[in-house]
């Protein structure tokens, strides 16, 4: 399992969340996404950060290479290609 931290530039937050929670969720599940959590950054309107949990790097790459995913991102109002940072868990610690 891997985690991915994404920075996404988008036009309208409600449009983005609407597509992300429906067509986007379907596409992510198809390609092995286990969960996603969306964050806003104070003072950065037009941008969200997303933390994904994915079954494997290969599954995530399959997601990125799917032409339907690109179309879904465009319909969400995503501007350009999101920036993805792949994270490897080092430790789970309490508190």
Locate each region found by the language model:
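Short S/T/G/P-rich N-terminal loop/turn motif that feeds into the first structured element of a domain
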Residues: 1-95
